[in-house]
Amino acid sequence: MSDEMAVPLQFTDAAANKVKSLIADEDNPNLKLRVYITGGGCSGFQYGFTFDDKVNDGDMTIEKLGVALVVDAMSLQYLVGGSVDYTEGLEGSRFIVNNPNAKTTCGCGSSFSI
């Protein structure tokens, strides 16, 4: 998708650049970053990230800087209006989800409730 189109989930330049670097390390240009939501964590739901070389029926693909972020339809409904970012700080380096739909989040930011 073009940056000009409204997408329900933003994929930041920082996240896309990190994905590009990790894909180059794996030497597999077909890999995409998949973000998903599962039940669990201290707040009820938790975010997960994995690399995947498949796009399933119903998945949304968001492209940026030549790499792709993939999210399944069920997870997307909880992520609409949010963004996937990458941060490096004192607590380490990680992909993060900024989710305006989350009513509460845990201290580490990987778990939330709606």
From Swiss-Prot:
Give the residues the record marks as binding iron-sulfur cluster: 42, 106, 108
- Superkingdom is Bacteria
A single GO cellular-component term from the record reads:
cytosol
What Pfam family is a match for this entry? Fe-S_biosyn
What cofactor is needed? iron-sulfur cluster
Q: Which GO terms describe its molecular function?
A: 2 iron, 2 sulfur cluster binding; 4 iron, 4 sulfur cluster binding; iron ion binding
Q: Does the keyword Iron-sulfur apply?
A: yes
Give the UniProt keywords, A-Z: Iron, Iron-sulfur, Metal-binding
Record-linked InterPro entries:
FeS_biogenesis, FeS_cluster_insertion, FeS_cluster_insertion_CS, FeS_cluster_insertion_RrpA, HesB-like_dom_sf
Record's cofactor remark = Binds 1 iron-sulfur cluster per subunit.
GO BP annotations of the record are:
iron-sulfur cluster assembly
Q: Which SUPFAM superfamilies match?
A: HesB-like domain (SSF89360)
Q: Which NCBIfam families match?
A: iron-sulfur cluster assembly accessory protein, PRK13623.1
Family that this chain belongs to: Belongs to the HesB/IscA family.
Query: Mind telling me which PANTHER family this protein's record contains?
Result: IRON-SULFUR CLUSTER ASSEMBLY 2 HOMOLOG, MITOCHONDRIAL
Q: How does it assemble?
A: Homodimer.
Describe the task this protein carries out: Required for insertion of 4Fe-4S clusters for at least IspG.
Query: What name goes with this protein?
Result: Iron-sulfur cluster insertion protein ErpA
Query: Its encoding gene is what?
Result: erpA
